[in-house]
C-alpha cells in the first residue's frame, strides 16, 4: 500500500503564494526609423512614388499614429537583395520564412538574456519556457531554437505559441501563472519576439489595411521570468503579483482583426470599428475582474493596455472617463517603439515600474496597489490580467 495519497502529492506540488513577475528584459533590432521619414522611405523602396494620393494618405496615417520611431530588422539592403518583398502580393513566403525562423529566436534570446541578468539566478533554475510569436512558424519551433541559443537544460518544459497576435502578451502571463502556481519552485521564462518582415509589402489601393500595418508595427522582443514564492535569500524580489487572469471573445466582433498566412506572407485585416468594439465592451471585463476586490473606480487602478493604436487608447479613456495620465505608460511605449504585437505589454510593464521608481512613487504600479493588464487581438479576443504592485522601497 502506498504511504502517501494523491491529495498529499498534489499539495506538495503546489506553490504557497501567487505567481509573481521576477524580472523583465527587452531587446530591439539595431535598425531604427524615424516615423516622420518613413513614408518617403517606404514609397521609395517599394518603387511606389507614382502613387501620390496613396502616399499622402499614408503620411496622414503615420502622423496620426503618435509614433516617433520604430525599430525594424528589414534594412534597405535586405530589400534590394529580395525585391519581391517590396511588391504588394508577390509570392515571397519562403524568403520571409528563411529569414524569420533564424532571426525571431535570436531577437528573443537577447531579451531573455536581459531578463535573466536582472533576475540574477543561474539559468539552470529555469524550469519552463513559453515562446510566443506571430512572425514565423517552423518545426522544431522557436521555443526549441531559443532554448538552444540560451543553453537551457534539455529537460526544460517548453510551450510554443504561434499566430496569436496582439492579445498574446496577456495570454502568456495567464499560462505562466497557472504553471508557476501549480508547480512548486517553477521558474517560467516567457519570451515574446516579433519581426515585421512577415507583413512588409508594397502599398495597394485595394488593401488599405496593409497600410495601417505598415504605419503601426515595429520589431521587438520582451521577456519576463515568472515564479511563485520568491526566494529572498538569493535575492529574488517580486515586481508585480499576478492575481487573476481571464480571456473573452467580444460579441459581434468576427473578422474585426485578422491575419492570414498566404504565399505572399502574412496579410493583415482590420475593421474600422475596432476601437469602438473594445471601448464598448471593456468595462464588462473590468467589472468581472475587480468586483471580487471591491474596486469600481477605474481611475483607482494602474493601466497596462496593449497600444493597438492611439484610437483604441483614446476611446477607452473616453468611455471609462479615465484621467489622461492613466495611459501614460502605454502611450510612451507606442511613441518610442510602435506596436510590437505580443511583445508590447512587457515593454509597458517595464516602463511602468521604472517610471514609478524614478518619480518616487510608493509602489511599482504608479503608487497604486491594483492594476489591469490588457491584451487585444484577433477574435476579437481580450485578455485581462489583474496585477498587484509591490512597494518600491523594499
Swiss-Prot record:
PROSITE patterns: CHALCONE_SYNTH. GO terms for molecular function: naringenin-chalcone synthase activity; phloroisovalerophenone synthase activity. InterPro entries: Chalcone/stilbene_synt_C, Chalcone/stilbene_synt_N, Chalcone/stilbene_synthase_AS, Polyketide_synthase_type-III, Thiolase-like. SUPFAM superfamilies: Thiolase-like. Homodimer. Belongs to the thiolase-like superfamily. Chalcone/stilbene synthases family. This is Phloroisovalerophenone synthase.
Amino acid at each position: 500500500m502506498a504511504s502517501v495519497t494523491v491529495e498529499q502529492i498534489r499539495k506538495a506540488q503546489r506553490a504557497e503564494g501567487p505567481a509573481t513577475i521576477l524580472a523583465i528584459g527587452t531587446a530591439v533590432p539595431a535598425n531604427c526609423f524615424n516615423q516622420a521619414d518613413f513614408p518617403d522611405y517606404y514609397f521609395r523602396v517599394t518603387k511606389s512614388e507614382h502613387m501620390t494620393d496613396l502616399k499622402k494618405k499614408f503620411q496622414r496615417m503615420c502622423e496620426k499614429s503618435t509614433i516617433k520611431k520604430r525599430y525594424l530588422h528589414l534594412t534597405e539592403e535586405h530589400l534590394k537583395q529580395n525585391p519581391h518583398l517590396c511588391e504588394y502580393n508577390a509570392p515571397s513566403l519562403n524568403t520571409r520564412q528563411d529569414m524569420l525562423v533564424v532571426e525571431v529566436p535570436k531577437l528573443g534570446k537577447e531579451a531573455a538574456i536581459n531578463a535573466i541578468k536582472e533576475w540574477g539566478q543561474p539559468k539552470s533554475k529555469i524550469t519552463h519556457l513559453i515562446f510566443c510569436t506571430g512572425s514565423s512558424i517552423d518545426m522544431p519551433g522557436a521555443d526549441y531554437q531559443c532554448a538552444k541559443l540560451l543553453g537551457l537544460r534539455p529537460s526544460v518544459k517548453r510551450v510554443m505559441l504561434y499566430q496569436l497576435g496582439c492579445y498574446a502578451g496577456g495570454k502568456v502571463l495567464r499560462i505562466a501563472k497557472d504553471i508557476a502556481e501549480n508547480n512548486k519552485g517553477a521558474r517560467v521564462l516567457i519570451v515574446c519576439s516579433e519581426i515585421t518582415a512577415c507583413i512588409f509589402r508594397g502599398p495597394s489601393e485595394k488593401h488599405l489595411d496593409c497600410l495601417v500595418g505598415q504605419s503601426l508595427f515595429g520589431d521587438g522582443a520582451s521577456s519576463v521570468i515568472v515564479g511563485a514564492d520568491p526566494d529572498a535569500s538569493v535575492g529574488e524580489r517580486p515586481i508585480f503579483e499576478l492575481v487573476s487572469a481571464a480571456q473573452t471573445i467580444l460579441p459581434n466582433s468576427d473578422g474585426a482583426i485578422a491575419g492570414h498566412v498566404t504565399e505572399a506572407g502574412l496579410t493583415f485585416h482590420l475593421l474600422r470599428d475596432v476601437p469602438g468594439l473594445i471601448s464598448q465592451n471593456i468595462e464588462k471585463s473590468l467589472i468581472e475582474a475587480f468586483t471580487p476586490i471591491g474596486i469600481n473606480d477605474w481611475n483607482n487602478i494602474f493601466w497596462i493596455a496593449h497600444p493597438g493604436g492611439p484610437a483604441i487608447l483614446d476611446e477607452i479613456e473616453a468611455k471609462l472617463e479615465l484621467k489622461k495620465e492613466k495611459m501614460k505608460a502605454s502611450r510612451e511605449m507606442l511613441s518610442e517603439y510602435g506596436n510590437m504585437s505580443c511583445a508590447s505589454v512587457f515593454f509597458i510593464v517595464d516602463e511602468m515600474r521604472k517610471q514609478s521608481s524614478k518619480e518616487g512613487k510608493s509602489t511599482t504600479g504608479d503608487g497604486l496597489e491594483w492594476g489591469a493588464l490588457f491584451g487585444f487581438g484577433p477574435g476579437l479576443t481580450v485578455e485581462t490580467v489583474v496585477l498587484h504592485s509591490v512597494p518600491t522601497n523594499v
